[in-house]
């Protein structure tokens, strides 16, 4: 019997008890970061910009492939997701996080739970707290949304359902653009399904809120990490904060281009391409002027499918860089080794 995504995450719980929200007018010591807390905290910033790709460009596959190879991240326009839907998901996210704390806590993630309100799963790997709050959706949000909005939760559930539908189609399209640039064909990935549309894949929607911060240079919204996914698609409101790291230039900010989405390569796509596409380290910084919201679609394979480097992308004279493993197995490694996981499993 195959595992649902909820089962996968539940089998590797990372529970961080919810503490009282910080006083948003001052920065407590528990929220004050230094390079001792994260070696890359003060790494240099760069004026470089992420590639911005118009998905209607006739050379889109080449552009996506090049961005995946050189950056592991890029921004996209003309992606086909209705602007009305992006407005709706942003409105939902803002409405959720503006609820009174006690109301949000009614939908708090349980100790062995996956969905609901809480802090980032990566928080357990750091000594300092992050200046953010989140809400995780896996499957139907009906149970949790009913607690938050007793009288009008159904319209919010419909927004999530429509958002997921559009994101899944977009993720599949981007996947084929990226892999197609490497010469990968539909027959090379059996688990893409009979129509090669990746209908059996699974995903998490992560809603994030980064309140304005009195001392943003000493705080961290979401610490540096890679995603345990094939691909992540993020929509951010009109406030900058997302940064990606490249060894040769340092931290690069992804500016909020109206209507655009940010895409980043995850650990599993790095494995699938035998290391050709880097799984990019990224983080979220905060500011003292305005709150920031982001909505991430974390897309992965069917949870029990074996993921391994595609034979077409492995030098016949060398062994694959990574072994075969399921998403479930990889998450078990990530739950223990965090950002060292790819190094740990490498052949």
Curated annotation (Swiss-Prot):
Catalyzed reactions per annotation: gibberellin A20 + 2-oxoglutarate + O2 = gibberellin A1 + succinate + CO2
Any GO BP annotation: response to red light
Molecular function terms from GO: gibberellin 3-beta-dioxygenase activity; metal ion binding
SUPFAM superfamilies noted in UniProt: Clavaminate synthase-like
Binding positions (2-oxoglutarate): 292
Alphabetically ordered keywords of this record: Dioxygenase, Iron, Metal-binding, Oxidoreductase
Keyword Nucleotide-binding appears in the UniProt entry: no
Cofactor(s) the record lists: L-ascorbate; Fe(2+)
Role description: Converts the inactive gibberellin (GA) precursors GA9 and GA20 in the bioactives gibberellins GA4 and GA1. Involved in the production of bioactive GA for vegetative growth and development.
Pfam families membership: 2OG-FeII_Oxy, DIOX_N
Tissue: Highly expressed in seedlings but also expressed in roots, leaves, stems, flowers, siliques and seeds. Detected predominantly in the hypocotyl and roots of young seedlings and in the petioles and vasculature of leaves. Not expressed in the shoot apical meristem, but found in the elongation zone, the quiescent center cells and the columella cells of the root tips. Found in the cortex and the endodermis of the embryo axis in germinating seeds.
Disruption phenotype: No visible phenotype; probably due to redundancy with GA3OX1. Ga3ox1 and ga3ox2 double mutant has a severe defect in seed germination and root growth, and a dwarf phenotype.
Pathway listed: Plant hormone biosynthesis; gibberellin biosynthesis
Textual note on the cofactor: Binds 1 Fe(2+) ion per subunit.
Organism: Arabidopsis thaliana (Mouse-ear cress)
Binding, Fe cation: 225, 227, 282
Keyword Metal-binding tagged: yes
Residue intervals of the Fe2OG dioxygenase domain: 197-301
Stimuli inducing this protein: Not under feedback regulation. Regulated by phytochrome. Induced by red light pulse and reaches its maximum level after 12 hours. Transcriptionally regulated by LEAFY COTYLEDON2 and FUSCA3. Not regulated by cold treatment or auxin. Up-regulated by paclobutrazol.
E.C. code: 1.14.11.15
Disulfide bonds: none
Homology family: Belongs to the iron/ascorbate-dependent oxidoreductase family. GA3OX subfamily.
Protein's gene: GA3OX2
Enzyme kind, highest EC tier: oxidoreductase
Protein known as: Gibberellin 3-beta-dioxygenase 2
Active site: 292
């Amino acid at each position: 019997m195959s595992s649902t995504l909820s089962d996968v995450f539940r089998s590797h719980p990372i529970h961080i008890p919810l503490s009282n929200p910080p006083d948003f007018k001052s920065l407590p010591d528990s929220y004050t970061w230094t390079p001792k807390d994260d070696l890359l905290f003060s790494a240099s910033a760069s004026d470089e910009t992420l590639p911005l790709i118009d998905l209607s460009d006739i050379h889109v596959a080449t552009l996506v492939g090049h961005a995946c190879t050189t950056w592991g991240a890029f921004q996209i326009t003309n992606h086909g997701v209705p602007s009305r839907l992006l407005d709706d998901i942003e409105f939902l996210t803002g409405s959720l996080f503006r609820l009174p704390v006690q109301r949000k806590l009614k939908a708090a993630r349980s100790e062995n739970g996956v969905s609901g309100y809480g802090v980032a799963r990566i928080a357990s790997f750091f000594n300092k707290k992050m200046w953010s709050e989140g809400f995780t959706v896996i499957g139907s949000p009906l149970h949790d949304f009913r607690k938050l909005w007793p009288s009008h939760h159904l319209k919010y559930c419909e927004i999530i359902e429509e958002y997921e539908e559009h994101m899944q189609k977009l993720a599949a399209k981007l996947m084929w653009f990226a892999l197609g640039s490497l010469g990968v064909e539909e027959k090379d990935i059996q688990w893409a399904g009979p129509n090669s549309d990746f209908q059996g894949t699974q995903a998490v929607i992560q809603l994030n809120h980064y309140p304005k911060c009195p001392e943003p240079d000493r705080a961290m919204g979401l610490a540096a990490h890679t995603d345990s996914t094939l691909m992540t698609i993020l929509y951010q409101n009109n406030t900058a904060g997302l940064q990606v790291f490249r060894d040769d230039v340092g931290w690069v900010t992804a500016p909020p281009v109206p209507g655009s989405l940010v895409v980043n390569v995850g650990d599993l796509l790095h494995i699938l391409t035998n290391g050709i596409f880097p799984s990019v380290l990224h983080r979220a910084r905060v500011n003292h002027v305005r709150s920031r919201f982001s909505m991430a679609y974390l897309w992965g394979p069917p949870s029990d499918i074996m993921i391994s480097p595609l034979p077409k992308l492995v030098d016949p004279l060398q062994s694959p860089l990574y072994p075969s493993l399921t998403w479930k197995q990889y998450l078990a490694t990530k739950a223990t080794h965090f950002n060292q996981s790819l190094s740990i499993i490498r052949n």
